[in-house]
Amino acid sequence: MTAFSTLNVLPPAQLTNLNELGYLTMTPVQAAALPAILAGKDVRVQAKTGSGKTAAFGLGLLQQIDASLFQTQALVLCPTRELADQVAGELRRLARFLPNTKILTLCGGQPFGMQRDSLQHAPHIIVATPGRLLDHLQKGTVSLDALNTLVMDEADRMLDMGFSDAIDDVIRFAPASRQTLLFSATWPEAIAAISGRVQRDPLAIEIDSTDALPPIEQQFYETSSKGKIPLLQRLLSLHQPSSCVVFCNTKKDCQAVCDALNEVGQSALSLHGDLEQRDRDQTLVRFANGSARVLVATDVAARGLDIKSLELVVNFELAWDPEVHVHRIGRTARAGNSGLAISFCAPEEAQRANIISDMLQIKLNWQTPPANSSIATLEAEMATLCIDGGKKAKMRPGDVLGALTGDIGLDGADIGKIAVHPAHVYVAVRQAVAHKAWKQLQGGKIKGKTCRVRLLK
């Protein structure tokens, strides 16, 4: 393991910040890519989510930011709003050593006018989806004249979503003299073609899936298709995870599994492609703040999910692609933490299990299912209040915290994460005081205005 301090160009303040964030040593992708990135070279990297790639390009682009220059100097393109939010959050943490650095996300599904207002003072860094960014470029609300670093994150996913033309159009607005960093989980011909068009003699780095595999205990259970839900309920009763993601291959199974867990008192939410954007946002917020213990999701819907301490991942169905299997289980061992991944295998999935074994070069750890016993509940510690207002009402976490602890009299220990979104604020409060907080906040005020509050269920 190589320490970040070996990178002589990182300033002491950044090294101190990395230490405070718990980043003590570099991941394989960081060790391979950062020297070239910090030297200003173009780099193309094939690596999975969870490999530390955000910090790799984040540390690089931050070294080129002049906070006294109020122009956009770095751009990160992402396939989804969720990934953009995740990347922006990580960049803000990495940028704590650099005061007054403005980072802005520009994604579809958010009011254009609100974004236009935020752009009156140009951000130093923009994290965006290609379509919405192109809208702003064409309307003249964003300028890339001072851009020195362009990053394309999950480039293969952007192509899958049909963003190829939009990416080309965006790049036409960028200066030719820039550093371009391209990250992709896979490397199809279309990605190689984009690299050839937009990069100059890039350093090619490939982090093999087996090299990047974190310290995860994998357990496999042979069961019938009909036996999967009872087995899942028993295993959740046994392990009692504070947070768990269950992966299903279809939206139908995703909802059926979620409903079955809730029926026995195991708090679960579902995340799949049929959800409206608002419902999707609320689901992600509620799971992240502890208002549900289990998230049942499809692979596409879970892209960009950022949960720091995920104790357990369950493959309700084995993925068709072994690379997807690695991507799934890697969510339970972020930043070097260990994790547990459980996979169910019905007889018709045996071939998929063999492919996973061959690819990862491991002997599968087959387990005996626990004996039939009573199902234990899995209750969430927190509940979520949704307050109308958010960024457009200039609400801050401190405003909400003050209302809850001052006017309503909640103990600070009863309040969890406060997430401020454009039109809403989501507040996690302990279940025991949730109804009291909701009822009293209904008639109360935040920043002098009466607020509309809902208790999400």
UniProtKB/Swiss-Prot annotation:
Amino acids binding ATP: 47-54
E.C. code: 3.6.4.13
Subcellular location(s) per record: Cytoplasm
Catalysed conversion reaction: ATP + H2O = ADP + phosphate + H(+)
One of the Pfam families matching this protein, by short name: DEAD
Biological process terms in GO annotation: ribosomal large subunit assembly
Span(s) of short sequence motif Q motif: 3-31
Motif (DEAD box) on chain: 153-156
Keywords: ATP-binding, Cytoplasm, Helicase, Hydrolase, Nucleotide-binding, Ribosome biogenesis, RNA-binding
Residue ranges of domain Helicase ATP-binding in the record: 34-205
The organism's place on the tree of life at top rank: Bacteria
Residue intervals passing through the bilayer: none
Region (Involved in 23S rRNA binding): 383-457
CDD domains: DEADc, RRM_EcDbpA_like, SF2_C_DEAD
Entry GO CC: cytosol
Stated regulation of activity: Requires hairpin 92 of 23S rRNA for optimal activity. ATPase activity is stimulated by interaction of the N-terminal domain with RNA.
Helicase C-terminal domain ranges (all copies): 230-376
Protein family: Belongs to the DEAD box helicase family. DbpA subfamily.
Subunit record text: Monomer.
Known role: DEAD-box RNA helicase involved in the assembly of the 50S ribosomal subunit. Has an RNA-dependent ATPase activity, which is specific for 23S rRNA, and a 3' to 5' RNA helicase activity that uses the energy of ATP hydrolysis to destabilize and unwind short rRNA duplexes. Requires a single-stranded RNA loading site on the 3' side of the substrate helix.
PANTHER family membership: ATP-DEPENDENT RNA HELICASE DBPA (PTHR47959:SF1), ATP-DEPENDENT RNA HELICASE RHLE-RELATED (PTHR47959)
Domain notes: Contains an N-terminal domain that binds non-specifically to RNA and a C-terminal domain that binds specifically and tightly to hairpin 92 of 23S rRNA.
Identification of the protein by name: ATP-dependent RNA helicase DbpA
Gene name as annotated: dbpA
